[in-house]
Regions:
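Structural/interface elements that position substrates and couple domains in central-metabolism enzymes
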Residues: 2-557
Length: 557
């Protein structure tokens, strides 16, 4: 069997892609299941896309019950059978989550719905759409950046979403509700998705209007993964009164809207814009802190303490330290979708956007400062960064998840490699880092961040270190990049002992308190941190005490 006929899970298990004969039997099986579930009073819901949002959303819908505790939905999750993602359907049908997270409820809810309630199945055949009463679309709409630090040169990648909408329109019953949860460029539901569906409906001889709606996720992978979908406020809208009524009813049935009420807007463009503005606001606050992070480093200020002091004021309680880069699927790109839509969907030629693209550009390049700190720390120890062995702790874009999309850590690895360092990586939530292992094709051919750096070819061989302590042996520098719980609990004495010698240590995300900083310095390490300008003050105190002790010893005191 050829390699491209197999999908390999993160654990290395191989799953042959389905044959033509299997497609036929698969749909017959689903049709029988759906008929049985519909007869028992359940609504048939198809979730398209089983990624970081779709897999958990499918489980949340499948877990929904009425007031008497009886299941009300039967969910079919659809994931296209590519070599990269087909394994997701196989694992999910075993009751195993295809996404890895700190939240134990992710595994529990999927296992419960697949094995106990039997309200959730996964498939690879798009014919499942023929059975749907509701379709939830969780397909990526990416924003492709043509240059580093200039978001304006990029464009929205609508092809996958447009193809999915077309496939949905070709298969669904006319009265099925189609709910787009994907973060899209404002105007997409009404001016892109609706015309596609309307045209295909006409070809099918369907006279009724497509029932299209939009509702965006506020998903936060991590310790409250499931709750961020099920137990959180949601915004929705429909393309017409019927769609608006249907989407409101559906979300009220599957989410805990009694405690977290829906906000129902008049048009999908308002819901779409709300998501873009919401995330652009967050990105702008983080970008604003980048310059103050540099100010703090150069003037003896601990930005962490400054932020904690500011957060006491209720109006500023959401200010946070920006970390080594603003990653995840949303913040690095969403503002770009709005800028792009203004010109390419709505046809305006003037330039009204100033702050939104600037914030993205600042955030995209912030992570390049971390390798400079590594270089400077090594230099202070009399070592060049070229040929230095560097261990990066944390590859994900945030704590307690295994999501590496637009992670600042990726940029750190690429820049350190360009500077000649030999980089090793550990992350407790990852088995593979596809941005490196498949950098010729991921996220798509010719669009890897590798194209912005030199010396990137060897990074195809980068593999996640399984044993963190073994990876520390003989290391020249350690970069603390992500606030995983494992790294927050690291003991300086054990770390230095495992390394076998003092090393350069760079804290990118305020993992170290003053006590740990002091201990690493006492053990002979050179410590630097993004926004942690007070470290020099701690070091000077230690050096002064050592000098004083030597002086006393010299004069016999």
């Amino acid at each position: 069997m050829q390699k491209n006929q197999v999908s390999i899970s993160p654990s290395g298990e191989e799953f042959p892609l389905p044959t033509r004969e299997e497609y036929q039997t698969e749909f017959a099986h689903l049709k029988a299941l759906a008929a049985k579930q519909r007869k028992s009073g359940k609504q048939i819901v198809v979730v398209v896309g089983l990624g970081f949002v779709g897999a958990v959303m499918a489980a949340v819908v499948a877990d929904a019950t009425d007031k008497k505790g009886r299941p009300t939905k039967f969910v079919i999750g659809v994931q296209r059978p590519s070599t990269r993602s087909f394994w997701k359907t196989r694992l999910l049908n075993r009751g195993v989550s295809p996404v890895k997270a700190e939240d134990p409820e992710v595994e529990r809810i999927i296992l419960r719905c697949v094995k106990e309630k039997q309200t959730l199945v996964a498939t690879y055949t798009e014919e499942a759409l023929k059975l749907a009463e509701v379709v939830v679309v969780d397909v990526q709409c990416d924003y492709l950046k043509e240059s580093l630090g200039d978001v304006r040169t990029g464009s929205a990648e609508m092809a996958a979403l447009e193809a999915s909408i077309a496939t949905i329109a070709e298969n669904i019953p006319p009265r099925a509700l189609v709910l787009i949860e994907t973060t899209v460029a404002p105007g997409t539901t009404e001016q892109v998705a609706y015309p596609i569906m309307k045209k295909i409906f006409k070809k099918r001889g369907i006279q009724s209007e497509p029932l299209l709606a939009h509702s965006y996720e506020r998903v936060m992978p991590g310790k409250a993964y499931v709750a961020s979908i099920r137990d959180f406020w949601r915004v929705c809208s429909g393309i017409n009164p019927t769609a608006r009524k249907r989407v409101t009813q559906f979300l009220n049935e599957v989410l805990h809207t009694d405690k977290y009420p829906l906000t129902v807007l008049d048009r999908p463009i308002e819901s779409e814009t709300a998501k873009i503005v919401e995330n652009s606001y967050r990105a702008t606050i983080l970008a604003f802190l980048d310059e103050w992070s540099l100010f703090a480093e150069r003037n003896g200020v601990d930005l962490k303490k400054v932020i904690e002091a500011i957060k006491v004021r209720p109006t500023h309680s959401n200010i946070i330290f920006p970390g080594p880069g603003i990653g995840g699927y949303c913040l690095p790109k969403d503002g770009g979708l709005g800028v792009w839509a203004y010109r390419h969907i709505f046809g305006f030629e003037d330039d009204i956007f100033k702050i939104t693209p600037l914030a993205i550009d600042i955030n995209d390049t912030r992570c390049l400062h971390a390798p400079q700190l590594v270089r400077d720390a090594l230099r202070n120890m009399g070592k060049p960064i070229a040929s230095a062995e560097v261990l990066l702790l944390g590859a994900a874009y945030r704590e307690d998840v295994g999501d590496t999309r637009y992670s600042g850590s990726e940029m750190i690895v690429r820049k350190l490699t360009e500077m000649g360092a030999d980089v090793k990586v550990h992350d407790p939530y990852l088995d593979h880092w596809w941005e490196f292992e498949a950098q010729d094709t991921y996220p798509r051919p010719d669009y890897s961040w590798a194209r912005f750096f030199h010396r990137q070819e060897p990074l195809k061989n980068l593999r996640i270190e399984k044993d963190m302590w073994a990876a520390m042996k003989g290391i020249d520098a350690v970069v603390l990049a992500v606030r995983h719980d494992l790294y927050l609990k690291l003991d300086p004495d054990r770390v230095v002992k495992s390394a076998g010698r003092p090393f350069a240590l760079v804290d990118c995300f305020c993992l170290l308190d003053d006590e740990k900083i002091r201990r690493y310095l006492q053990l002979g390490c050179e410590v630097k941190g993004m926004g942690r300008g007070h470290i020099k003050r701690i070091k000077d105190t230690i050096d002064n005490r050592r000098s004083g002790a030597k002086a006393k010893s010299r004069f016999g005191h």
